[in-house]
Swiss-Prot record:
Naturally occurring in which organism (per UniProt): Bacillus subtilis (strain 168)
UniProt KW keywords: FAD, Flavoprotein, Oxidoreductase
Chain coiled-coil ranges: none
Protein name, per record: NADH dehydrogenase-like protein YumB
Gene Ontology molecular function, alphabetical: NAD(P)H dehydrogenase (quinone) activity
Cofactor note: Binds 1 FAD per subunit.
GO biological process: aerobic electron transport chain
Family, similarity comment: Belongs to the NADH dehydrogenase family.
Gene expressing this chain: yumB
């Protein structure tokens, strides 16, 4: 048996971190290394389902599962704690309740909302970020509807929901919200015509980078279901009363709203910046083998990493699909570092992208084919189920998966 086995520490049980730890035991034997996984919760949550939990169309418990249920507990030491700092020079991770030494480090700490310095967003807008923020947003929206008819003087701002951002998360949330609002109106005796859902997007288009035909389909569907779009319009300030928005060279508009949702981008975790890695908005431009430049014992993946697409000379978007593929590569490369062997370069295999528009509608491109409506919605559920299967097998898929296809 090897003495002084190398210590592998994996930070974060998101898509990338969990994929690394579940695959690592295939490439590293019990006598080769000690494996520790650190996560602040005892559960993993499906980040790509948070728009559903936030709107209240899917219960938050359906969006998470216990980490101990999917890891090999005889091989992996799970530490539930919060990462406070990474000391690269000392090969040490500082936790809220202690410290961990490492020989090899995997950083998969995920993302935090990017507010671009817009005044009041952090204080007054609701992000779509995790189980806690989703639960809060869902309950807040329900409270506005419940309160509306109890007040002698009716307040339209309670029934006005502003969504900042018409990218992937924003559009998926709007799709769920459009489906949820009629249910809330029925439950709380509110006339649907009194409810306003307003999407504000600074870019000149909805779903940047998506096929224009699919964008038109998504916008038309959402408008039919009561969503108003203000495109080429930036959120300038968020206040307790609502938001100030405006186009360039035009007079700003005040929108009174008790519910402002911010879905316009994320940045890498601040701990990655504070650790001293060269980064862009908290994301480290990693080497082809997913190691941090200048740090041969540190791998970075998921939202914490920036991996360039050589064809477009732009970074790949930080998706769950890529994070999981990175996790497999990191697991293989850790095995090769410990046992000897040439490290593998990460090659993303983009199978497609699908944006949901509620439970039974979606738009996307899969294997080069454009999909919309029911076929796209079917594929979205297949993709969601596949991520469960890859980490937790058939048991987890049957327990948490989505099978209401039509």
């Amino acid at each position: 048996m090897a003495l002084n086995k190398p210590k592998i520490v994996i930070l974060g049980a998101g898509y990338g971190g969990l994929m690394t730890v579940t695959r690592l035991t295939k490439y590293v034997g019990p006598n080769d290394a000690d494996i520790t996984l650190v996560n602040k919760h005892n559960y993993h949550y499906e980040t790509t389902w948070m728009h559903e939990a936030s709107a209240g169309t899917l219960h938050h418990d359906r969006c998470r599962y216990q980490i101990k249920d999917v890891i090999n507990q005889s091989r992996v030491n799970f530490v539930q704690d919060t990462v406070k700092a990474i000391k690269i020079d000392e090969k040490k991770v500082v936790l809220a309740n202690g410290e961990l030494q490492y020989d090899y480090l995997v950083i998969g700490l995920g993302a935090v909302p990017e507010t671009f310095g817009i005044k009041g967003l952090k204080e007054y807008a609701f992000p779509i970020a995790n189980i806690n923020t989703s639960r809060l947003l869902r309950e807040h929206i329900e409270l506005q509807f419940a309160t509306y008819n109890t007040e002698a003087e009716k307040r339209p701002d309670r029934l006005t929901i502003v969504v900042g951002g018409a990218g992937f998360t924003g559009i998926e949330f709007l799709g769920e919200l459009a489906a949820r609002v009629p249910e809330l109106c029925k439950e709380y005796d509110v006339d649907r015509s009194l409810v306003r859902i307003i999407c504000v997007e600074a870019a000149p288009t909805v779903l940047p980078g998506f096929d224009p035909e699919l964008v038109d389909y998504a916008v038309h569907y959402l408008e039919e279901n009561g969503v108003e779009f203000k495109i080429g319009t930036a959120v300038q300030e968020c206040t307790p009363e609502g938001v100030r928005v405006g186009k360039k060279d035009e007079e700003p508009e005040q929108i009174k709203s008790q519910t402002v949702v911010w879905a316009a981008g994320v940045r890498g975790h601040p701990i990655v910046e504070e650790a001293g890695f060269e980064n862009m908005r908290g994301r480290v431009k990693v080497n082809p083998d997913l190691r941090a430049p200048g740090h041969d014992n540190v791998f970075i993946l998921g939202d914490s990493s920036l991996f360039m697409n050589e064809d477009t000379e732009r970074p790949y978007p930080p998706t769950a699909q890529i994070a999981m593929q990175q996790g497999i590569t990191v697991a293989k490369n850790l095995g090769r570092l410990i046992k000897g062997g040439e490290l593998e370069e990460f090659k993303p295999d983009i199978k497609g992208t699908v944006a949901s528009l509620g439970e039974h509608n979606a738009v996307g491109v899969v294997y080069g084919r454009k999909l919309k409506g029911t076929p796209a919605s079917f594929m979205k559920k297949v993709i969601d189920n596949r991520s469960l299967f890859m980490i937790g097998g058939l048991g987890l898929t049957l327990k948490k998966g989505k099978f209401k296809f039509f």
